[in-house]
């Protein structure tokens, strides 16, 4: 696949229906809908067809469903695959399949369940020449962009300590670290 294909809309496919409970409910399946020059064509999700999936397809604009990711990649021949699951242990297999086919990736965070898997994913992207983006939208929030500008300009001095905080309630702990921690750490190094 080459980056110079601009004569047609970019084809985007979705891996996993994130409208399912415990799959994120982040709306990542709708991230590309309505963007100019983009066509969302299909969702691959192994679960049974449900009203929830039908709604996710309607929201995303996808018109086809596949039970298997590799079949979807081969049939749809997408430019970009969106890995929608927030479960990092589900990312590596579809990323391997996409990289083998030269499909660019937009992946829900956290990228991987282990450092070894993250290194493998980075190596796959580099070796195949694909672009890999991890979903960290908080860095584009106006408040954080202004904070970054103030820090970089020296207007508020040099930060000495940065403290990250999650929900600070019963939902905290390891789950909070996985769900919010990557955003907090991303903002700290942004």
Where are these regions (language model features)?
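N-terminal Rossmann-like dinucleotide-binding module
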Residues: 1-60
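Acidic-histidine catalytic/liganding microenvironments
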Residues: 35, 75, 141
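Short, Asp-centered acidic motifs that coordinate Mg2+ and/or phosphate
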Residues: 42, 80, 161
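Beta-loop-alpha module in the N-terminal Rossmann-like domain of NAD(P)-dependent dehydrogenases
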Residues: 61-124
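A contiguous active-site-proximal alpha/beta segment in oxidoreductase catalytic domains
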Residues: 112-174, 182-184
């Amino acid at each position: 696949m080459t980056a110079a294909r601009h004569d047609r809309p970019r084809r985007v496919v979705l891996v996993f229906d994130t409208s399912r409970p415990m799959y994120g409910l982040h709306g990542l399946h709708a991230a590309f809908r309505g963007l100019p020059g983009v066509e969302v064509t299909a969702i691959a999700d192994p679960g049974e067809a449900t009203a929830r999936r039908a709604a996710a397809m309607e929201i995303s604009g996808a018109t086809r469903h596949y039970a298997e990711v590799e079949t979807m990649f081969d049939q749809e021949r997408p430019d970009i695959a969106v890995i929608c699951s927030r479960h990092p242990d589900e990312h590596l297999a579809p990323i391997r399949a996409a990289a083998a086919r030269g499909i660019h990736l937009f992946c829900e965070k956290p990228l991987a369940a282990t450092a070894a898997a993250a290194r493998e994913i980075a190596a796959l992207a580099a070796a195949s020449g694909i672009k890999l983006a991890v979903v960290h939208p908080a860095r584009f929030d106006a408040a954080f962009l202004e904070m970054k500008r103030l820090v970089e300009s020296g207007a508020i001095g040099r930060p000495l300590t940065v403290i990250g905080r999650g929900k600070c309630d019963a939902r905290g702990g390891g789950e909070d670290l996985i769900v919010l921690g990557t955003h907090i750490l991303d903002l700290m190094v942004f």
